[in-house]
C-alpha cells in the first residue's frame, strides 16, 4: 500500500492538470503556429513557463486503484500486477484466464 500522502499528491496533480489543460493547449497552439509573430511566440513561451510544474500532464503517474502502487500498472484494468493477479484468480475479472501452454 502506497503512502496516503503520495496518493493524495497524485490526485492533486490530476486536478491541476485538468484545471490548466485548456490554457496549456492554447499556449502550445500559439507556439506551434507558423503565422504567429516572434513576439507573440515569446510571450506564449514565457506564459507557459510561468504555469505550475504540476499542471503538466507529463508529471502524472499511473497508480493502482486499490493499493496506489506506481509500478507494474496495467492500464486496461487500472490495477497493479499483484492485485490484478489476485482478482483474476478469484474470478473477479471477466474474460481473463491464466495462461497455459
UniProtKB/Swiss-Prot annotation:
<dbReference type="InterPro" id="IPR001209">
    <property type="entry name" value="Ribosomal_uS14"/>
</dbReference>
<protein>
    <recommendedName>
        <fullName>Small ribosomal subunit protein uS14</fullName>
    </recommendedName>
</protein>
<dbReference type="GO" id="GO:0003735">
    <property type="term" value="F:structural constituent of ribosome"/>
</dbReference>
<dbReference type="GO" id="GO:0019843">
    <property type="term" value="F:rRNA binding"/>
</dbReference>
<comment type="subunit">
    <text>Part of the 30S ribosomal subunit. Contacts proteins S3 and S10.</text>
</comment>
<dbReference type="Pfam" id="PF00253">
    <property type="entry name" value="Ribosomal_S14"/>
</dbReference>
<keyword id="KW-0687">Ribonucleoprotein</keyword>
<dbReference type="InterPro" id="IPR023036">
    <property type="entry name" value="Ribosomal_uS14_bac/plastid"/>
</dbReference>
<keyword id="KW-0694">RNA-binding</keyword>
<keyword id="KW-0699">rRNA-binding</keyword>
<dbReference type="InterPro" id="IPR018271">
    <property type="entry name" value="Ribosomal_uS14_CS"/>
</dbReference>
<dbReference type="GO" id="GO:0006412">
    <property type="term" value="P:translation"/>
</dbReference>
<comment type="similarity">
    <text>Belongs to the universal ribosomal protein uS14 family.</text>
</comment>
<keyword id="KW-0689">Ribosomal protein</keyword>
<dbReference type="GO" id="GO:0005737">
    <property type="term" value="C:cytoplasm"/>
</dbReference>
<dbReference type="GO" id="GO:0015935">
    <property type="term" value="C:small ribosomal subunit"/>
</dbReference>
<comment type="function">
    <text>Binds 16S rRNA, required for the assembly of 30S particles and may also be responsible for determining the conformation of the 16S rRNA at the A site.</text>
</comment>
Amino acid at each position: 500500500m502506497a503512502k496516503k500522502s503520495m496518493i493524495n499528491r497524485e490526485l492533486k496533480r490530476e486536478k491541476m492538470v485538468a484545471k490548466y489543460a485548456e490554457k496549456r493547449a492554447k499556449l502550445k497552439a500559439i507556439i506551434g503556429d507558423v503565422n504567429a509573430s516572434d513576439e507573440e511566440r515569446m510571450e506564449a513561451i514565457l506564459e507557459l513557463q510561468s504555469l505550475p510544474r504540476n499542471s503538466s500532464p507529463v508529471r502524472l503517474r499511473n497508480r493502482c486503484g486499490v493499493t496506489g502502487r506506481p509500478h507494474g500498472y496495467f492500464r486496461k484494468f487500472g490495477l497493479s500486477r499483484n492485485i490484478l493477479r489476485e482478482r483474476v484468480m478469484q474470478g473477479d475479472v471477466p474474460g481473463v484466464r491464466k495462461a497455459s501452454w
